[in-house]
């Protein structure tokens, strides 16, 4: 069901096309760091076609306007022959202009579609690398605890205590779900509330209770669409699902809603298609929500336990700020997420992700990895939070801007981070 997002039908430029024109080599070099082939030449060819189509359309519009004025002048001068010739020209222009406008629209959509599939470009200080092996350790908190026994896996403990039930969850919903009961159900709720209270009371975040179902254009705004459509869960009205055939696919897509994979999606989109006053920035938002992921690319990975579930609970942090403040805001967000683990006295490390391991929308990412003694042979670090600065990448997709003292609208910068994943902390 892949297709063009509704948000892409206008000319929304996800990357600064002027920057690509000015320095195509730098754009291709940034893509290479992401493990991608050069694209500047093909993008600029589409851009040139688009600009030529716009020029033709504008010239035709201008000529129609001037010819219409000349008709009046010719009639005043009683030059009937010239007036007739000009009227014929205007009629022809009226016929050709829809074709020219259609060519502009087609070129707009072609460029937007190509740009929509290109990830954000890494900042200069992001480490080189193609996968997790290129990530760089930034710092460590705490130490590995020594046990007089062999630690068990969390799911073995949970099942033995009667507080985790994967078998019944599978009957209800299939694989990668769990039923939490008794003390673990209460503990999960308490941990989530602790995280939320910490971020709102001590870190200055505003609590939000957002919708869990969102439109395609909202998913597009934060970068889940179009590339990761298969990783999402979708809710569709029963009447549409019952009548699915090839002719109904378009309507199915236009009316479906996506279950949020993270509260980043609705929180960041709170500023979509708007211009906020610079005095309102930074906006710091947080939410405790269920999250839903199809995990289409995770077949065979972490099939046991609560590490990789289709449904999980997470506290999300989102910041909307100005370009000049986003670097410091990234460090602040990381510190807020770390404070959760410090207060829980959990051993963790912070990793700076390399260019090839970052998420689609990120310019730079810090992962917080918590030590899990029951994982692997003798324990292992596993991600519990990911804090990313996205620059204006998401803002361009959402058309989210701020107005400074000079009155000129500029794109905001967006940041997001887990504060943290409740199930993994549990």
At which residue positions do the language-model features occur?
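A cross-taxon signal for low-complexity, glycine/charged-rich
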Residues: 6-8
């Amino acid at each position: 069901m892949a297709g063009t997002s509704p948000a892409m039908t206008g000319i929304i430029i996800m990357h600064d096309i002027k920057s690509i024109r000015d320095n195509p080599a730098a754009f291709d070099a940034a893509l290479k760091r992401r493990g991608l082939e050069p694209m500047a030449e093909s993008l600029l060819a589409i851009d040139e076609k688009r600009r030529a189509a716009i020029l033709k359309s504008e010239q035709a519009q201008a000529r129609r306007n001037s010819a219409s004025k000349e008709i009046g002048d010719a009639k005043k001068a009683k030059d009937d022959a010239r007036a007739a010739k000009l009227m014929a020209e205007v009629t022809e222009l009226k016929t050709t202009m829809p074709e020219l406008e259609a060519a502009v629209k087609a070129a707009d959509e072609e460029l937007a579609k190509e740009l929509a599939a290109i990830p954000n470009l890494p900042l200069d200080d992001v480490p080189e690398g193609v996968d997790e092996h290129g990530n760089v350790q930034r710092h460590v908190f705490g130490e590995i605890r020594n046990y007089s026994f062999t630690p068990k896996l969390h799911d073995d403990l949970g099942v033995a205590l009667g507080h985790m039930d994967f078998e019944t969850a599978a009957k209800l919903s299939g694989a990668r779900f769990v039923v939490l009961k008794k003390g673990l159900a209460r503990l999960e709720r308490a941990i989530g509330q602790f995280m939320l209270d910490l971020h709102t009371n001590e870190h200055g975040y505003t609590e939000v209770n957002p919708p869990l179902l969102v439109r395609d254009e909202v998913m597009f705004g934060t970068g889940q669409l179009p590339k990761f459509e298969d990783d999402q869960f979708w809710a569709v009205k029963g009447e549409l699902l019952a009548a699915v055939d090839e002719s109904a696919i378009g309507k199915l897509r236009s009316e479906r809603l996506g279950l949020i994979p993270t509260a980043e999606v609705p929180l960041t989109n709170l500023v979509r298609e708007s211009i906020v006053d610079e005095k309102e920035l930074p906006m710091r938002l947080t939410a405790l929500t269920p999250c839903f992921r199809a995990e289409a690319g995770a077949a065979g990975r972490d099939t046991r336990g609560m590490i990789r579930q289709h449904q999980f609970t997470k506290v999300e942090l989102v910041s909307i700020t100005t370009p000049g403040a986003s670097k410091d805001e990234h460090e602040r967000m990381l510190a807020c997420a770390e404070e959760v683990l410090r207060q829980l006295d959990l051993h963790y490390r912070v990793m700076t992700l390399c260019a090839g391991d970052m998420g689609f929308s990120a310019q730079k990412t810090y992962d917080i990895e918590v030590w899990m003694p029951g994982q692997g042979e003798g324990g292992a670090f596993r991600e519990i939070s990911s804090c990313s600065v996205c620059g204006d990448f998401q803002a361009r997709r959402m058309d989210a801007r701020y107005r400074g003292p000079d009155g000129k609208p500029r794109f905001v910068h967006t940041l997001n981070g887990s504060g943290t994943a409740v199930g993994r902390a549990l």
